[in-house]
Amino acid sequence: MKNENHPDSAVAHTISVIGSSWTCLILRDFFLHGPRRFQQLQDSLKGTAPTTLSERLRSLEKNGVVDRRFYSMSPPRAEYVLTAKGRELGPIVGAMRDWGRKYGR
């Protein structure tokens, strides 16, 4: 049984939302560039399979971190944008960047 009062449960929940491979890099792209289309993310994240990117975006959307917005254009266009909940992850992504700069190669 899950103990919600355990201090690590909040960390475990955060990891369940953003801890999958590529997810933090997807978030980084949103913080660097703002709203993104699928192909823009695909081009930026060299090496990620389209199915993986699609799964990560679906998970972020399901968890309320990103919204998918559709535009009535020809051809139809969808764009992903951070929600208020997603923008609150900015300090976490920033701290990861700072740590990487300090201790990376």
Task: Give the residues covered by each predicted segment.
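Basic, amphipathic "hinge/linker" alpha-helix immediately C-terminal to the N-terminal HTH DNA-binding motif
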Residues: 19, 72-95
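Glycine-centered, phosphate/nucleic-acid-interacting loop/turn motifs that mediate DNA/RNA or nucleotide
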Residues: 64
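Short beta-strand "wing" residues that participate in macromolecule-binding interfaces
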Residues: 68
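Hydrophobic alpha-helical core bundles mediating ligand binding, dimerization, or RNAP-core interactions
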Residues: 11, 15, 93-100, 104
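Residues within the DNA-recognition helix of helix-turn-helix
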Residues: 56
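N-terminal helix-turn-helix DNA-binding core of bacterial DNA-binding proteins
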Residues: 2, 9-52, 73, 79
